[in-house]
Amino acid sequence: MKSILRIAIPLAAVVLLSPLAAAQTTSAQAPAAAPSAPPSAAQTLATQTFSADQRREIEGIIKSYLVAHPDVLQDAMDALDKQQKQADAAKARETIKSNNATLFNSSHQVVLGNPQGNVTVVEFFDYNCAFCKRALPDMLTLLKADPNLKFVLKEFPVLGPGSVEAAHVAVAARMQDPTGKKYIEFHQKLLGGRGPADKTRALAVAKEVGFDMTRLEKDMNSDEVKTTIDEDMKLADALGVSGTPTYVVGDEVVVGAVGLDELKQKIKASE
């Protein structure tokens, strides 16, 4: 409790000390000149001088108040959380706007669905991400239900060397299949299959789907593949993506496997 109070007292003081200070007849000196507007609580605190005894008394009052009203702490934390989320959302909107071309229309990206769709969903994913596996049916359902949906896949291989290897194979496979018809089968089998994804497994899936393996093994180490993955990673960093799956729908970043219904709502809101 003491550690909480050490954090809470400065916050609570802004609210509580202003009326308390006014009641102290021996404490503060009045400002030299009256401000044009009533001073804020923070300004009042800045211009008040309390003795050590007065500070102890005030801290005791605050402590008693917080013990009697612990919901104040929760309210303060909720308000701070809301403020932070609003700031994060505003920053994300600005980042999406400034990276619009690369995010939605890069020449390196994988596009599923309608390339000219009126709504675009971008997904950052990792082939070894359990939550991405869980979210795969959501993507397939959305693509089947909406012929105007453009779905962009961005590689974000952060779950180890196997993920990086799988990403290289996947990007090389996309290079052979600009339409995405074979790629989506590859993507489903690799992401939806059991066991860890790595170079060996990704190549086996690519062979099963019918890609040109000689070309693929050459392409997977090409500058094109490296550039694609680097571009995706830089975008993820700019957007503050720290886990997968993370979606961009319209001007909003949506974190996690939120489910089909919420994705539908986000898509509808962005139309």
Model feature map: region roles:
Residues K2-A101:
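N-terminal targeting signals for export/organelle localization
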Residues V122, K133-K207, D237-S242:
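Structural alpha/beta surface segment adjacent to cysteine/selenocysteine redox centers
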Residues C129-K133, P245-V248:
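The canonical Cys-X-X-Cys-His
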Residues A52-R56, V67, V119, A130-K133, ...:
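Soluble non-cytosolic domains of exported or imported proteins
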Residues G60, S64-D75, A79-K82, Q86, ...:
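Surface-exposed, polar/charged faces of alpha-helical domains
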Residues A101-V119:
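A short beta-strand-turn-helix
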Residues I4, T25-E59, K63, A204-E271:
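C-terminal cap of thioredoxin/glutaredoxin-like
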Residues L45-A52, G60-S64, V122-N128, E155-L159, ...:
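Second-shell loop/turn segments in exported
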